[in-house]
């Protein structure tokens, strides 16, 4: 009997990329109060540690940034964090990993670990402010630990689908993240109007974004609710926005396009 049990465990390990264990919590999310939905240093460390097994997984291709593009993307993150220190109480820095994939994807892990796909950057991020919108979105999630309440035990590797699964949030959660990300984008000196453009791009190209958004109906609802939010927002801070993208932005985009 013991031998049969051991064989079953071996078979399970060879056929799965990870075991998912639910992480239960009865606490409610309140972004405005600074509450972390997935509190606990151990859980934060656990999720952050998934970066390495994911990057080593079969089929996952990572595009290494050169020094110039690395400094550029780090400077954008520094702008977001530095101009919003009241909001970012935990995060002091962030890193961006580029996935060499044609699918438009973005997701993150705790401790400011952000992942963007080559397809997202080259096809859809047409303006520097839009890039900042995406970075702000993932930084908010990382700061507030807004990830599904489950523990993932990687067995050898971690698939892209499982990593994308960590980006799944309820409609209410996503709307709170959108509102904060829009605010932080403006506070960082970028054009907040591109946040709506970003949601519209996903809604108009659902076939491309299906892996990212999951529920097509939800992204449609997100756009509608965000428009209503913008109409009601009458006390937006007066900040001088960068209307034009920097030369460094176009250098960054062209560099990513060079991947063969």
Residue ranges, per PLM feature:
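Bacterial N-terminal signal peptides
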Residues: 3-13
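C-terminal capping/extension segments of zinc metalloprotease domains
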Residues: 16-71, 83-91, 122, 172-260
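N-terminal post-signal-peptidase region of extra-cytosolic proteins
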Residues: 59, 82, 97-101, 117-118
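Catalytic zinc-binding patch centered on the HExxH motif and its immediate surroundings
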Residues: 97-112
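Short alpha-helical catalytic segment bearing the HExxH-like zincin motif
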Residues: 115-116, 130-138
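Catalytic Zn2+-binding segment of zinc metalloproteases
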Residues: 121-129, 138-155, 189
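Active-site His/Glu-centered metal-binding helix of metallohydrolases
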Residues: 135-144, 176, 180
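Substrate-binding clefts and substrate-entry loops adjacent to catalytic sites
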Residues: 145, 151-172
């Amino acid at each position: 009997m013991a031998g049969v049990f051991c064989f079953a465990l071996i078979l399970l390990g060879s056929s799965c990329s990870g075991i998912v264990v639910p992480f239960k919590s009865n606490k409610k999310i309140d972004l405005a109060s600074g509450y972390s939905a997935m509190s606990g240093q151990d859980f934060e460390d656990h999720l952050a540690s998934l970066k390495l097994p994911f990057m080593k997984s079969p089929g996952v291709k990572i595009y290494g940034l050169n020094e110039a593009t690395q400094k550029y993307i780090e400077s954008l993150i520094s702008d977001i964090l530095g101009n919003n220190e009241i909001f970012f109480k935990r995060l002091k820095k962030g890193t961006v990993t580029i996935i060499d994939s044609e699918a438009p994807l973005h997701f993150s892990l705790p401790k400011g670990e952000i992942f963007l796909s080559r397809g997202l950057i080259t096809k859809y991020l047409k303006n520097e402010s839009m890039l900042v919108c995406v970075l702000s979105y993932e930084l908010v999630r990382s700061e507030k630990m807004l990830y599904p309440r489950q523990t993932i035990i990687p067995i050898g590797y971690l698939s892209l689908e499982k990593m994308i699964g960590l980006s799944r949030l309820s409609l209410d959660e996503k709307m709170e993240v959108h509102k904060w990300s829009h605010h932080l984008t403006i506070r960082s000196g970028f054009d907040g109007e591109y946040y709506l453009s970003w949601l519209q791009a996903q809604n108009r190209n659902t076939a491309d974004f299906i892996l990212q958004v999951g529920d097509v109906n939800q992204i449609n609802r997100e756009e509608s609710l965000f428009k209503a939010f913008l109409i009601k927002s009458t006390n937006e801070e007066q900040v001088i926005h960068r209307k034009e993208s920097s030369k460094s932005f176009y250098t960054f985009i062209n560099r990513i396009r060079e991947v063969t």
